[in-house]
Amino acid sequence: MTNYAANLQSVRAAAQRLAGLAHRTPVMTCATLDRLAGRELFFKCENFQKVGAFKFRGACNAVFRLAAEVAARGVVTHSSGNHAQALALAAKMRGIP
């Protein structure tokens, strides 16, 4: 059997860590697109998230999971886009220089 890192317990723990940090973004629908697709579609509007992308959730979860002694050493990423912006904001929110 395959062992996945994500399970219900880890998802709930991440949700607790993100409470008050990440925006609760809306889920929207569009009747026109539903008709065209022949089914009901839902759109999670992560463009309303901090830094304008879903990447903030993962970066924030990772930064706030770090032990204090690890966080004190700082964080680094190889990105020039949404992930870099998300990590920088999450680190700032945690007080990591």
Model-predicted regions and their roles:
Residues 1-97:
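PLP-dependent amino-acid enzyme catalytic core
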